[in-house]
Design a protein with these regions (language model features):
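Short hydrophobic/aromatic helix or loop-helix immediately within or flanking a transmembrane segment
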Residues: 77-84, 96-121
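Transmembrane-helix signature of polytopic, membrane-embedded enzymes
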Residues: 28, 140-162
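Short acidic/glycine- and proline-prone juxtamembrane loop motifs at membrane-interface regions
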Residues: 168-176
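Short hydrophobic alpha-helices at membrane interfaces in multi-pass membrane enzymes
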Residues: 189-211, 241-247
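Transmembrane-helix motifs of polytopic, lipid-linked glycan transferases
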Residues: 127-147
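Transmembrane catalytic cores of multi-pass membrane glycosyltransferases
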Residues: 64-74, 86-89, 96-97, 210-363, ...
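Signature aromatic-anchored transmembrane alpha helix within multi-pass, membrane-resident enzymes
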Residues: 405-431
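Short periplasmic/luminal acceptor-recognition loop of GT-C membrane glycosyltransferases, typified by
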Residues: 450-543
């Protein structure tokens, strides 16, 4: 009997292992051959790199229950107010009025209120930020592909999603960044649409994205429409098509005009005009310049881009990270220039379209750089704080448009290796983000602990005396933490005063004087006699030993919980009554008068007998 075939497959023979190893080598050889033939597309490499990098940049969002952001708690408080507009028992009704409308900043509030109907505000905001982080490189890749560029550099948009605007709580500005990229991509695809049907559909899509950008943020809307017009004008399409494509921006401009004409001016200020805005901008920019030379000031701002773009952490780790990110961008530029001389097919009209889009990308980059260099740091009259630094993110995003299209000429293993620098950087920086976000979560764990022990349904006020963070490099980043109370303890009666109500871009206005609630910026001005009739809970952080917030009313409050530097006090039920005056001390009897003892006369000195004296005299 021939059993050789059976023996060849026995484990002891070792031949099965050899065949498996040979099969594995064949698979690797075929894969390498497939890569070397140039069949690996740029889109395929980007998709694989995107899926590999995505978990590293979503993980930080789950490292802390409350995401960092200076203004974020105030926005969530405003969203809580909007969700209760029209309710007869709304705790905000006696003090605030407002509602959703066509205006900048509205997109974030619309998303929060809509998602808040099926989930909590904290979960809704975290979902929005997840979409934002995941969408940034996708929008960048769409723009690069529309400009006939490689999509792979778009992987560098992942770390740029964690930028200054996100950590400062400028959520609307941050959310508008991928929408700017999306608008430029849609405008480019619109002017180059090949069929009438595709042009009509693209026109509707571009108009919708422009409206979305307007209700996200005003500054990026103005930049985005100017950049998209440059992309339309510099395209290879006819002037008639360029004009019709540009008309897709008209609905968004109509929304801008409606908002500007129907919004009342800020209390105490004249109605904003172009001349007045220019006056404010010029004055504050010259104040920033001071006695320095223009060349020194501009160069100093350029050197500050790494400190501004990805700003977030006290240890300054974001600065070398941003420099490393920029070096990878420069490396992609150099590789693209070198690969440009490689042999490849030239098809019309792609070379002309690539040259035109390269010019459009340069215009977009220079526009973002001009905004960063020309705008002032603060523009209080127009409700703009930390103004020019926020455009540093846009400068780096637009720099990706300068990467030559020569990357598309790479073939074989070069294409597979192209995403590796971005992936390695993303993995390292993603882990760093996770550690910092986890440390921030530990820092605010004391507030979460006392908030969870605070009953829902009350009106709360925060008194943060030390608002500095040991993790986040953002001024006063902890000042708004008490405003998370309605999101952490949701109920019909839960309320905190939404800050910034009354500003033109905010969806709420005060019906009473602002002094009805102590400003979070002035905790030392807290007056218990004025605040106790309105508020039920008081979150206090780092109370100074020399300041007694409940002076004269200690009998009206009681400690609910304390954890770390945080404490929460509850107002006792009943009428507000001040502490009784301290009992008068018992009168101290006057000390008895001390009478000096009468002097005692010394005993008389005995004298000699007279007779004796006389006898002697004789």
């Amino acid at each position: 009997m021939d059993i050789s075939s059976k023996e060849s497959h026995t484990p002891d023979s070792g031949e099965g292992k050899g065949e498996a190893a040979s099969g594995g080598r064949d698979v690797v050889r075929r894969a390498l051959g497939w890569c070397w033939t140039g069949k690996v597309s740029d889109a395929w490499c980007f998709a694989i790199g995107y899926l590999l990098a995505l978990p590293f940049f979503l993980a930080p969002l789950f490292a802390t229950r409350l995401l960092p952001g200076l203004d974020l708690p105030f926005h969530l408080a405003a969203a809580d107010m909007l969700s209760k507009v029209g309710l007869p028992d709304s705790p905000y009704a006696p003090y605030y009025e407002g509602g959703l409308r066509i205006a900048p900043y509205a997109a974030h509030f619309i998303a929060l209120v809509g998602l808040g109907k099926v989930m909590g505000l904290l979960a809704a905001h975290k979902l929005i930020v997840m979409v934002y982080v995941a969408g940034m490189p996708l929008a960048m890749a769409s723009l690069l592909a529309a400009c006939r560029r490689s999509r792979i550099p778009a992987l560098l948009a992942f770390p740029l999603a964690y930028n200054l605007t996100l950590h400062y709580g400028f959520i609307s500005f941050a959310l508008s960044l991928p929408v700017v990229l999306w608008l430029l991509a849609e405008m480019t695809k619109l002017v180059h649409a090949e069929t009438r049907r595709a042009f009509v559909l693209r026109w509707i899509g571009t108009a919708a994205v422009a409206i979305l950008l307007f209700i996200c943020h005003l500054q990026n809307f103005l930049y985005g429409v100017c950049a998209s017009l440059a992309f339309a004008v510099l395209s290879v399409a006819s002037w008639r098509r360029k004009l019709v494509a540009s008309l897709a921006l008209v609905p968004a401009f109509a929304g801008l005009a409606y908002w500007h004409l129907t919004s009342p001016p800020v209390v105490g200020q004249a109605k904003l005009t172009a001349k007045l805005a220019w006056t404010f901008l010029k004055r504050h920019r010259l104040d920033d310049l001071g006695a320095a030379k223009w060349t020194d000031d501009l160069w100093h701002r350029i050197l500050l881009i790494p400190a501004h773009a990805m700003r977030g952490f006290v240890d300054g780790s974001h600065v070398p990270a941003c420099r490393g990110l920029f070096l990878i961008m420069v490396a992609y530029v150099l590789v693209g220039m070198i690969a440009w001389s490689a042999p490849g097919e030239k098809k019309e009209p792609r070379p002309l379209r690539r040259r035109r889009m390269r010019m459009a990308g340069l215009v977009a980059f220079l526009g973002a750089l001009a905004a960063y260099l020309a705008l002032p740091h603060h523009l209080q009259e127009m409700e703009l704080m930390t103004f020019f630094p926020r455009f540093s993110v846009l400068v780096l995003l637009m720099f990706l448009l300068l990467v030559p299209s020569g990357l598309l000429r790479l073939r074989g293993l070069f294409v597979v290796a192209l995403p590796l620098p971005a992936l390695v950087f993303g993995a390292l920086y993603g882990q760093q983000l996770y550690r910092h976000y986890k440390a921030y979560g530990a820092e605010i764990a004391g507030f979460v602990a006392v908030a969870e022990k605070t009953p829902p349904g009350g009106k709360a006020l925060g008194l943060v005396f030390d608002r500095r963070s040991s993790v986040m490099q953002v001024e006063s980043t902890l000042i708004g933490i008490p405003s998370f109370y309605p999101a952490l303890r949701p109920a019909k009666g839960s309320m905190v005063p939404p800050n910034y109500c009354g500003l033109r871009h905010m969806p709420c206005r005060l019906k009473v004087p602002a002094e009805f609630a102590t400003s979070p910026w002035l905790p030392l001005s807290f007056a218990p006699a004025a605040m106790l009739p309105t508020f039920d809970y008081f979150f206090v952080r780092s109370q100074p030993p020399t300041f007694d917030p409940f002076r004269g009313y200690h009998g009206m409050v009681e400690l609910v919980a304390q954890s770390g530097l945080w404490a929460v006090y509850r107002k006792k039920p009943g009428p507000i009554v001040s502490d009784p005056p301290p009992p008068r001390p018992a009168p101290v009897p006057a000390p008895a008068a001390i009478v000096a003892p009468a002097p005692v006369a010394p005993p008389p000195t005995p004298s000699k007998p007279v007779r004796a004296l006389r006898g002697k005299k004789r």
